[in-house]
């Protein structure tokens, strides 16, 4: 089995597990720009001890390049766990992250995520240069 066969995809507007990548469609070369990746943007994803998003990972694949590059790995480790019991804890993290990057060529941003119940999901967004 190939790793790519383990990932599910869909439209983030209709499926709560798919990462929504938000950034400008075209950016200036070699200048930092913000990217936000979230899950459940249109349909809320649960955030409980029993059902939650554990991480989001982001990559950039430059146009015409054989290789992709890891941009960031973001873990969400608090989901209401507590010695008192599930969902009794004092802290929760939310499955949204904003970071900045700069690129020298156009390419594709790819985001993957992991739901502890429903597994691996991914999405992508093309980014052009102005």
Curated annotation (Swiss-Prot):
The keyword Transport applies. Its cofactor is Fe cation. The keyword Cell membrane does not apply. One of its GO terms (molecular function) is superoxide dismutase activity. It holds the Pfam family Desulfoferrodox. Binds 2 iron ions per subunit. Keywords: Electron transport, Iron, Metal-binding, Oxidoreductase, Transport. InterPro entries: Desulfoferrodoxin_Fe-bd_dom, Desulfoferrodoxin_Fe-bd_dom_sf, Desulfoferrodoxin_SOR. Its EC number is 1.15.1.1. Fe cation binds at residues 15, 17, 45, 51, 115, 118. It comes from the Bacteria. It catalyses: 2 superoxide + 2 H(+) = H2O2 + O2. Belongs to the desulfoferrodoxin family. Monomer. Has a reduction potential of +190 mV. Non-heme iron protein. This is Neelaredoxin. The lineage of its organism: Bacteria, Pseudomonadati, Thermodesulfobacteriota, Desulfovibrionia, Desulfovibrionales. The gene is nlr.
